[in-house]
Amino acid sequence: FRDGTLLTLLRNSVIIALLATLISTVVGTMAAVGIHSMKGRLRSAVMTITNIPMTNPDIVTGVALALLFAFAGTVLKTNSVLGFWTLLIAHITFDLPYVILNVMPKLQQMDKDLVEAALDLGCTPFQSFTKVVIHEIMPGIISGALMAFTMSLDDFVISYFVTGSSFITL
């Protein structure tokens, strides 16, 4: 802990992991709720697309995102597009499936009558969502957030491909 450069790199890694975890947990939870309400083939197709980042090797995802960001830099006519924001977007993309797949089982286990009971007792739909649904799926949200943080902090390959020289992590 005496090397200042190493501490800066550790700080950068933790910042990216925390931000990616926070954003992917919120977005992933909302996505899981949306996917849970879908039916049939649409739900199956969305779940298949959700699993792609998990089934792809990290190097394929890293190269694909690097090409996407390079193309975006060409279109936007910016020289150094790779950096903090591209790394954050890549980590969010990488973390989202883990959050969704941790929240989905809790949504499937939840008793649907609880929401209707809350509505019957005078809650608004927003109140029933925040007080009943979120409360019921909280273990899935927490496990998804922990999984996202761990995966984001552990990831090297994707970070290597999508980070420019302006923002370096461990």
Predicted regions: what is each one?
Residues 35, 117-118:
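Short loop immediately C-terminal to the Walker-B catalytic DE motif
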Residues 40, 124-128, 164-167:
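Gly/Pro- and small hydrophobic-enriched strand-loop and loop-to-helix capping segments
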Residues 131-132:
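Low-complexity, Ser/Thr/Pro-rich intrinsically disordered linker/stalk segments at domain junctions
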